[in-house]
Design a protein with these regions (language model features):
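Long, low-complexity, intrinsically disordered cytosolic termini of multi-pass membrane proteins
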Residues: 1, 8-11, 20-22, 34
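A detector for small-residue-rich transmembrane helices and their helix-helix packing motifs
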Residues: 2-6, 32-33, 37, 41-309
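Canonical RING-type zinc finger of E3 ubiquitin-protein ligases
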Residues: 19-30, 37-41
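The −1 position to Zn-ligating cysteines in a subset of zinc-ribbon hairpins
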Residues: 11-14, 26, 34, 47
Length: 309
């Protein structure tokens, strides 16, 4: 163990540009210590001012133009520390809901009250329970299910939340969960669904659109979206080679591709709204468009009620 005096003498424990500021965060490129004022969030970790300048020097004209167009406005992010508080909070709440769901006797009742089942939106089947449209994102079928979803949420959220700001990120997540549930009601009205996959795909969709808008390389994101969306179909196809029934095989995979699709589409729309209304004076327009999108999503729920029930 090092003594306090040894700690103070070690310059690696302080920002290289501000020697009086203690920090333990390193630039991902040059590995120099940087304080909160000197760090710029990157796809992985943070970048110091010098490395950021070098990166901008190698940007293409299109990327520079997109960056100027984005940064001309007031910063979207309101998280000065860069800590993804909303992301961590969502993970904590979801984890707590999963733990409660494991409690004998009580857990099953609570999980059943939170899961989404489209008939609960139809008056003739009993009291309407609209909260299920959102709370299904809190319920997971097993440790692997919640583990993969929360891992994806962490990797995307820690990069996307500082860019959008906490409240925009939360709105995106909730609308993604809503979009996934609406898609299930439209495309699989007799299916019970649980999980945050719809909301996760919404984050992917928003990241894809916003990344394209600022001139970032979105190929990796696009590939990840394609792989995650396609894999239940691939598994079902392989399984159907022996059974001959692709539809039944797809249903037995246990993955709601409908929720994935709904979340992805809604996330892309929200990302487009954020990218197009980033100016401070456009905030009323942004809020209005988000409200309009929410109304449209709830309005779409009339279709399964009329068609299926």
């Amino acid at each position: 163990m090092s003594t306090t005096e040894e700690f103070r003498r070690n310059s690696d424990n302080f920002c290289y540009r501000h020697p009086d500021r203690q920090s333990f965060v390193l630039c991902q490129r040059c590995l120099r210590t940087v304080c909160p004022e000197c760090r710029t969030p990157a796809a992985v970790g943070v970048i110091c001012p010098e490395c950021m300048a070098q990166q901008r020097a190698t940007e293409t004209p299109a990327q520079k133009k997109a960056q100027r167009r984005w940064s001309r406005s007031a910063p979207m992010a309101a998280v000065a520390s860069g800590r993804p508080v909303a992301t961590l909070t969502i993970i904590a709440i979801t984890g707590l809901a999963y733990v409660i769901g494991l409690v004998p006797g009580v857990g099953g009742i609570i999980s059943n009250a939170l899961a989404f089942y489209p008939p609960f939106l139809v008056p003739q089947f009993g009291p309407i329970e609209p909260w299920r449209l959102f709370t299904a994102a809190l319920v997971h079928s097993g440790p692997l299910h919640i583990g993969l979803n929360m891992l994806a949420l962490w990797f995307i959220g820690r990069n996307l939340e500082p860019l959008l700001g906490r409240w925009r990120f939360v709105v995106l997540y909730l609308l993604g969960a809503l979009g996934g549930s609406v898609a299930v009601a439209l495309l699989a009205p007799t299916t019970i669904v649980v999980g945050a996959s719809g909301a996760i795909f919404a984050l992917f969709g928003a990241l894809l659109v916003i990344g394209r808008h600022i001139g970032a390389d979105i190929r990796v994101i696009a590939v990840l979206i394609g792989i995650n969306f396609a894999w239940p179909f691939v598994v079902a196809f392989i399984s159907s080679l022996t059974t001959g029934d692709f539809g039944a095989a797809l249903a037995n995979v246990g993955v709601s591709w409908q929720a994935h699709l709904g979340g992805l589409v809604v996330g892309a729309l929200v990302g487009w709204i954020y990218a197009r209304t980033r100016l401070l004076r456009q905030r009323p327009v942004q809020i209005g468009l988000l409200i309009a999108l929410t109304i449209v999503l709830f309005g779409l729920l009339v279709i399964p009620v009329v068609v299926y029930y």
